[in-house]
Amino acid sequence: MTSELETPRSPLLAVATAFAAGITCNSCLPAPATVYLGISIILGVVWWRYRHHPQVATGCLLLVIACGGGLRHHVSRSLGPPGSIARRVTSTRQLSQLNGVIVTVPRTRPPPHGAAVHQRPTTRWQLRIETIRHRFHSEPATGRLQVIVNDRIRGLDVGDRVSLTGWLERPSTARNPGGFDMRCFLVRQGVCGILVVRTVGGVRRTGFSRHSVDRFRRWLAALREAGNRILVRHLSPRTAPVAAALLLGLRDELDDGHRNMFIRSGTMHLLAISGLHVGLLAGLVWTLARLLRCGPAVTSAMVVISVCSYALVAELRPSVLRAAVLVTIHALGHPRRRRAATANSLALSALILLGIRPGDLQSPGAQLSFLAVAALAWSAPRVIKLVPLSEASSTVKTIVRRTLQAWLVGLAIWCVTAPLVASWFGLVAPVGLLVNVLMIPLVSLALWLGVLVLGFGGWFPGLGVLAGGPLDGILGLVLEIARHSAASPLAFVETPAPSTSWLLLFYGLLTLAVTSQHRRLKSLWLVGLALALVIGLLTALKPPGDRTLHLSVLDAGHGGAILLECPNGRTLLFDAGTLGDPGRLSRTIRTAAWQRRQRRLDAVLLSHADRDHFSAAADLLGLMPVGSLLISPTFLASGQREALELCTDKTRMGASLELVIAGDRLLLDPNVSIVVRHPPAGFAGPTDNSCSVVLEIGYRGRRILLTGDIEDVGQRQLLDRPGTPIDILLAPHHGSPTANRQGWVEWTRPEWVLVSGGRTTTRKKLQQAYRAGTPILCTR
């Protein structure tokens, strides 16, 4: 969307668009390579026949390019040669012994905050497979795997050869509405499977690879680690992780608190190495070269070498690769005083990026990077005309006008990228409009000082100290600005992700509006854009229109989260807990509710005081409005600190606390019967599980039974009452055989059995317990 978009001088723009369209078509409608080759041959014949008709010939060429994009995407997603590990990865996990080379730096993640005590750290890296053991001998294999070791492991580096024994499995797709698609994420990186190693004993280092590419990767990893050590030596513990993220792209050094602070202040992009950092580095090298009186050719060569080297250190992230290509094109044209069209340069960088990694078309980093640059290129010339600079102006006026120009350009970029940011991250940060104008100059100074620290701090400690002091102060100021910005009342708004169809409509109309040459058409597209915004807001605020009972059993790992939506739109959440990351589960629940266009939970009922049934409730109360928190009297009797804190803090979150016992009815919808069946008043079971709340839901002659972990004495008390058939049963205690014995099966006689969590053997054991033909659905 640059000024060049309005002229026919950007032929590569059409080429890049066609190539991207081909990738999109193949990702939506996969087709074999023969289809693309056959279509290309037919189009080639048509082009030859109509080569003297420019429009037909151009259309044929663009379609051939689109076929090339589809073919490139197909090749990147194909199973590969017969020895590819992708052919061995199936939906059923399998114990495997592999040998391969580590290609990414092993990173250790601590257990998530609030996780169970037995949770251990995990160490992750990507592995290039060389051999796999089949029966009694090893066979050659190719491909990449994501390795997850369920423990902390040290002494491994990029380029090391390792022998691994673990469980080979296929990455999962999105397990919940609006959830993260791990399979798609890994496939974009060329990873086709996951190897889970249970203990450190399943990992054995056997040497290191002498392959030139592996040795180069090892050298780059060592260079990044050496740079990180220099930063730690010259900066305070508070600012060193920020400097590592800013200068070396080591965002794993940031803790969750700092990461969330930068996200909520709308400044996270300043820490993620991107085109901004590449541009600042290029500007620094350019300035130094001019001060040294280098000629245009030498200056351009210095810029290109510096930028390309930095891109390699930054692991060729999409935004970095795009910026490196743009800077290289500009630098190569400078000695000849030739300036490439911005749209052409942007299209060329897109072609290079998609040719190397076609999956980056679906990457948020690549999408936001190209969109932001397009908005920058389109808005900058117009802002300069709107707020011109005058040579007669005073220094103060010049600074004010420069600041206003920067803010207006930032406003244009923010408005264009906000829908895409909301789609990927569920968040819009208006405070970034103000903060970025202050932060960019500080980040620029920090980057330049950081280059001095990294470049000379290892050889000349004195120079490192001289540059490290100001760098530490600037980064401390950046942290303070981000902290106060994130804590401001209107810093950020968490929002449901807009639909893909709405995004296509919005950006399609926006493209037509900025490229249209006719004023009337431009006005028409702008009106359409305004209508699209209004329709999007109304659709997001409109409640679900199906007017029926809707039950969603979310994947909570080993835990439970069941969302019930009544026909009148009111909602009930039964349980909110997991043995994994409770913060992640709380966000999963909110996202699932948002996907159903539900903005609040009218009631949250916690079955009992086991952490895998209530651990996410506290975070959930802070994420979305909750009307009532419902518990049984035995919940508080458990004496657990977390349970008591939850009930103490619930009023601060705006939720009322109510006790429920057997016989109570929840009045959410007059057409839905919701009755508590257990525990009765005064019941005191020997375990928390036996005290679990059991909820019966009736609607139009159908019955649903939500059971928590009911077993032992509590279950026997239920069995003493007359039983009636259940249409949908939530298997008690995550499908445990001890809670699903024959007496329980005969008492419930379910048509369907749902399992929240459970083990890999749960389904088979339940199929033996319940009558033949009973469908059993598991979240895991």
Give the location of each predicted region:
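Well-ordered beta-strand positions enriched in small/hydrophobic/aromatic, beta-favoring residues
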Residues: 125-127, 195, 246, 352, ...
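Hydrophobic alpha-helical transmembrane segments in multi-pass membrane proteins
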Residues: 14, 22, 55, 195, ...
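Hydrophobic alpha-helical transmembrane segments
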Residues: 7-13, 248-252, 314-320, 445-457
